[in-house]
Amino acid sequence: QIPANMIERIEVIRGGGSALFGSNAIAGTINVITKNPIKNEAQAGVVSSLIAGKAADVVSSLNGSLISDNYTRGISFHALHRARQSYDANGDDFTEITRLRNLNVGAKLFNDFTDRHKLTGEVNMSNENRRGGNKLDEPEHLADIAESIRTQMVGGTANYEYFSPAYNHKFTAYASGERTRADN
């Protein structure tokens, strides 16, 4: 859910059990590396569509960046909201496509204290609610068939880089964390 214009590169690391990512990275990892902002800018957009001419699907997005005059401090941010109505293709009162509410927001900040000291922080939040089946406006236990997913995720990273005076050594300290809650 990160806008393409904010992505610097994507790293694919094959294989499991990496010392860096732990034993849960069974098949490998995919890392999305975001850009540091280089200019002040903002973009906004809305895409609206209809599923079979009946169910609305609206995606709104905003992203941008602010940077100091001397390019030593900056922030980039992004937000996306999606609202999709449920869709019943055959009129049996059961959804073929679930109702969806999704909100994703994030920001990346950086501060270059000097040429040799740099601090970067990133935070992302996602909240998604899906509901399908029938009797969508009632609790799931009152429906004949219910598909329901509620997911909340908050994650962040911090990275500090130090270069030696001769720039022949580099020290990096990195920390990350994530909290995910899923109710299905």
Predicted features along the sequence, with ranges:
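Transmembrane beta-barrel domains of outer membrane proteins
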Residues: I13, I33, N63-I67, H78, ...
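Residues that define the transmembrane beta-barrel architecture of outer-membrane proteins
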Residues: P3, N24-I26, K54-S60, R99-L103, ...
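N-terminal periplasmic accessory domains that precede
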Residues: Q1-P3, V12, N24-S48, V58-L62
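Gram-negative/organellar outer-membrane beta-barrel architecture
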Residues: A55, D69-Y71, I75, A79-S86, ...
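Flexible loop and strand-edge segments within Gram-negative outer membrane beta-barrel domains
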Residues: R84-N104, F110-D112, R116-F171, G177-N184
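Outer-membrane beta-barrel architecture
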Residues: K39-Q43, D57, T72-G74, K118, ...
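Outer-membrane beta-barrel pore domains and translocons
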Residues: G15, I33, G45-I51, H78-R84, ...
